Structure formats: C-alpha cells, structure tokens
Amino acid sequence: ILNRRKSRAGKSLEHHLETIFKFCDLKFETQVITEEHKKPDFIFPDGASYHNFEFPADDLICLGAKTTCKDRWRQILNEADRIPVKHLFTLQQGVSKNQLAEMYREKVCLVVPKPYIRYFDESFQDKIMPLNVFTGFVKAKQNRL
C-alpha cells in the first residue's frame, strides 16, 4: 500500500508540473522513450527533437520529478544520454550537503519551489534553481528555436 501511495504522489507531482508548464506555454513531452527504453519524466521541447540528431543537444532539457530524492535521484543520470546536465525537481526540503555535492559532480541541477531554497545548505543555495527560474530558462531556449 505504501508503494502505491508513493507512486500516486509522484504522478500527482508530475501532473502539477505539467499544469505549470502548460500555463507557462512551454513545449514539452512526458515519458519519451530514450536509450535502452528509459523514460525521463519531461523532455523539452519534445521526443522528436530528442531523437533528431540534427537538433542541437544544447537546446534539449531533461527534467526528472521526485517527491523526495533519497538515492532514487540517480535514476535520472542515464535517462537521456544526449543531455549532459539533468534537472531534477523535488519537494524534499533540505537534501544533505554530501548528496548535493554528489548531484553537482554528476551534473544534476536541483530545481525546487523558491521558498524551499532556504532549507538547503548555504554553500549550495546559489546552485539550486527555483522553479520559476527553470521555467524562464526553458522559455528562453524555446524562444530561440
């Protein structure tokens, strides 16, 4: 039962993010099948662009969504090989300093609601992207296409 609740919470988080991304008029696709049948939560702008090797990899963005990070954040590392920096949205307040350092080394950019940033170690707060900055980042890339 606990796993079903966690799964529902994860799906609910994805649906909330979809609503935000649609409101921001972002182009995205969910559950795109990538290498080795992996399915990142969100690919910006879409799966066709991801699979088109003439489309610049710099204009692709991958976002994983996890209600909590724990060790599961590593799942996003190999979900989209064309995209070197992965973005990870979480609702978890305060990830450990060691885990943040590992994420940073693995080129994972943490994305959280802006009010949550204060719960993270001060030395990493400037590396964490507020959700509103992330949507602006995606929009800026998409406006150049």
Describe the predicted segments one by one:
Residues 1-38:
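Acidic-basic catalytic patches of nuclease active cores, encompassing PD-(D/E)XK
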Residues 18, 76-77, 100-101:
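Short amphipathic alpha-helical segments and helix-helix/interface helices
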Residues 21, 42-69, 75-78, 88:
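Conserved catalytic cores of phosphodiester-cleaving nucleases, focusing on short active-site segments
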Residues 36-38, 44, 119-120:
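Short secondary-structure capping/turn micro-motifs that flank functional sites
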Residues 71-73, 96-97:
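Short, well-ordered alpha-helical microsegments
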Residues 93-145:
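Domain-level recognition of nuclease-like catalytic cores that cleave nucleotide substrates
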